[in-house]
Amino acid sequence: MGRQNIVVVVALVFMAIIGLAAAASSPSPSASPSKAPAASKTDHVEAPVTDDQIGTTDDDAAPTPGDGDVAVAGPLGSDSSYDNAPTGSADSAKSGAAALGVSAVVVGVTSIAGSFLLL
């Protein structure tokens, strides 16, 4: 009889984990390049270029053949590469914690209810 209780509790915990995985927020779809905001153009003074520098020396992306209206990211680590990054909403970090808290409560309640049902 005790072994059946363990099986039921494990099954309930497994279902709660599946519920948590299903309720977790999916990653937001990335914005298409044609809808990405254009990087702001600001004038600033750059350090002199040395012979050891590789790649572009400014924040502009390399020219590409094709649509000139499409915004593309600049070199890695440049200021313009961060301008096109998607921003999360203010409560997106809290939503995962709330789902985890609700899931923990559901697991606790279902395991206690399951143990009382099979006693």
UniProtKB/Swiss-Prot annotation:
Lineage of the organism: Eukaryota, Viridiplantae, Streptophyta, Embryophyta, Tracheophyta
GO biological process: pollen sperm cell differentiation
One cellular-component annotation, GO: membrane
Region annotated Disordered, chain positions: 24-93
Chain ranges passing through the membrane: 99-118
Subcellular location: Membrane
Identification of the protein by name: Anther-specific protein BCP1
Function recorded in the entry: Major pollen protein required for pollen fertility and development. Active in both diploid tapetum and haploid microspores.
Source organism (scientific name): Arabidopsis thaliana
Coiled coil residues, start to end: none
Ranges of biased composition (kind: Low complexity): 24-40
Residues making up the signal peptide according to the UniProt record: 1-23
Highest taxon of source: Eukaryota
Keywords of this entry: Developmental protein, Membrane, Signal, Transmembrane, Transmembrane helix
Membrane topology: Single-pass type I membrane protein
Chief subcellular location: membrane
Biased composition (Polar residues): 78-87
Cytoplasmic-facing ranges: 119
Residue intervals annotated with topology Extracellular: 24-98
Tissue-level expression: Expressed in mature pollen grains, developing microspores and tapetal cells.
